[in-house]
Every structure is written in structure tokens, then in C-alpha cells.
Design a protein with these regions (language model features):
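Catalytic cores of carbohydrate-active enzymes across secretory and cytosolic contexts
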Residues: 1-282
């Protein structure tokens, strides 16, 4: 170390490294995404959206930003492709979280989905300095229906997708709060976790605000990015599903269901609830 020829290049290289961003503890950012492409050793991603999310976590670690990731643990992950007689086939490989780079946390989250209560445990992955929390409903306390909520990434019908998105959004907030986090900002990587706004709205309405006032209040804390602004890349839910799963939320807000649905319906379109529109408005 006394040899300047050795230490000077190291000092020069270190000086070129950007200084870490120092934020206060109360400025934690919670980054919600349906997939995280951190490593092939943690197969919880499909493609570009997940790779982007994984890179965000790694960059946050490098810059020492107080960011945490929140998503779902998919026991069967995303399908793998195989060819049989020239035709594509899909197959799934079951992932045992205890054999992955995951640690069980003490958090347990309960969420009512329509008329059923589902419980989720929370796994933690360390991405450098950044923490990633993944909710998993494959618990014996749940019935078979409940255990399948977090089974696969981007599979199932629209109702299955709605259950997953309610779990990720509403359940995700409850999970990280149990673990001691109170984020200043919530970053939505696409609209899949947009239902987290329901939990935030309920808290503000509980303080005496109207729904419209609550929307203005939570808007200060939500950041939304969309990467595929085309119909095929945006989740849309039919009115019957919205009434089935969000009717209880309208009651909590003290409004009729139509007033809640207006937050996600585009003018001149059909009556389906558009998650991108909802996330932009809140």
C-alpha cells in the first residue's frame, strides 16, 4: 500500500464512482413489481419487465438507496418452453423456496378475496444491500384454492390475475409494515400492483377525508411507470369481477361502486376497469 504506482490507479478509479445517495430513514421507497429478474437462481421472472426490476434493485444497492422490492413468490415460476414434434409445449418446474436464496420472515398477511380469507407468508431475498420481499400463499392453513393464488407468473384467467394483484398490492403493503417499513413513496412497475392504492385510500378515508380528497392525498406518495402502453400489455377487469372483489372497498370508502369504478374507466371505452388508467389517476 506504500507503493504509489499501485494505490494511485485505485484512488483514481474510486474517485470516479458516483457518491451514494443518502436519504433519511423515513424516505424509503417501496418498489412493487410482478416479477424480479435478479438471477437465474431465483426464477421469478418472465422477460424484460423482470430484468428491469432486478436491475433497479441492484442499482439501488450500489447507490445505497433505501429501496425495498415487493412482489409475489411463484411456486411454479414462469413456464419453460419445450418442443415436441415441432410444436411448442409449456412445462413448469416447482421451486422450493428453502433451496433458493430466500429467508423466511415472521410476517403473516391475511387478505379477504371476495368471501374467502387467504394467508400469505413473506420470504426475503438479499440483493446486495437491497431487500426483496415475496408473498407466498402456499400454506397449509389455506385451502387448495388459496394455496394456488401465488402459484404461477402470468397464468390463469382474469379472476386469478385479480386475486394475485390484490395480494401483491394490498397484501404487499401490510407485509412490509409488519416488517417495520413505512415507505415515503410507492413505485409501481406497471399497473399489476395498483390495488395497493385501495389500502392507502382506506387509511385516508378513515381519517375523515372523502374519497376524492383521499385520492389527492395518496397521489403524493405513488409513482407509476408503464412500459407497454398498448391494450395487450394492460390489465382490464370486467364489472362483475370488480363488484365481486372491490365491493367491500366501496363500502369502506362510503361511496357507491360506480364512483370507485370511475377511477379506472376510460372515457368513450367499454366499462372494463383499466389498471393503467387507475394507477395514473391515483
Amino acid at each position: 500500500l506504500a507503493d504509489g504506482k499501485f494505490t494511485e490507479p485505485a484512488r483514481t478509479a474510486h474517485a470516479r464512482i458516483p457518491q451514494p445517495i443518502h436519504l433519511e430513514d423515513n424516505e424509503t421507497v417501496a418498489y412493487f413489481s410482478p416479477e424480479f429478474g435478479v438471477s437465474e437462481m431465483l426464477p421469478q421472472y418472465s422477460g424484460g419487465l423482470g430484468v428491469l426490476a432486478g436491475d433497479h434493485l441492484k442499482a439501488a444497492s450500489d447507490m445505497r438507496m433505501p429501496l425495498i422490492g415487493v412482489g409475489l413468490f411463484y411456486r411454479d415460476g414462469f413456464f419453460r418452453q419445450a418442443l415436441e414434434q415441432g410444436r411448442q409445449r409449456e412445462r413448469y418446474v416447482t421451486n422450493n423456496p428453502r433451496f433458493l436464496a430466500l429467508t423466511a420472515t415472521p410476517a403473516r398477511v391475511e387478505l379477504t378475496l371476495a368471501d374467502k380469507v387467504v394467508t400469505a407468508r413473506v420470504w426475503q431475498a438479499n440483493v446486495g444491500r437491497t431487500r426483496l420481499f415475496l408473498l407466498d400463499t402456499d400454506l397449509e392453513i389455506n385451502d387448495e384454492w388459496g394455496r394456488r393464488v401465488s402459484d404461477r407468473l402470468y397464468s390463469g384467467d382474469r379472476e386469478h390475475r385479480m386475486r394475485q394483484e390484490l395480494l401483491m398490492g394490498v397484501g404487499g403493503i401490510r407485509a412490509i409494515r409488519q416488517l417495520g417499513y413505512e415507505p415515503a413513496k410507492f413505485h409501481l412497475n406497471e399497473g399489476h400492483a395498483g390495488f395497493l392504492a385501495l389500502e392507502l385510500l382506506a387509511e385516508e378515508v378513515g381519517k375523515g377525508l372523502t374519497l376524492s380528497q383521499a385520492v389527492e392525498e395518496i397521489r403524493k406518495r405513488i409513482v407509476f411507470t408503464t412500459h407497454t402502453p398498448v391494450p395487450a400489455g394492460i390489465d382490464r377487469f370486467a364489472p362483475d369481477l370488480m363488484h365481486k372483489y372491490l365491493g367491500v372497498w366501496a363500502e369502506r370508502f362510503g361511496v357507491n361502486m360506480n364512483e370507485l369504478l370511475e377511477l379506472g374507466i376510460l372515457p368513450g371505452s367499454d366499462d372494463h376497469f383499466n389498471m393503467a388508467a387507475f394507477c395514473i389517476r391515483v
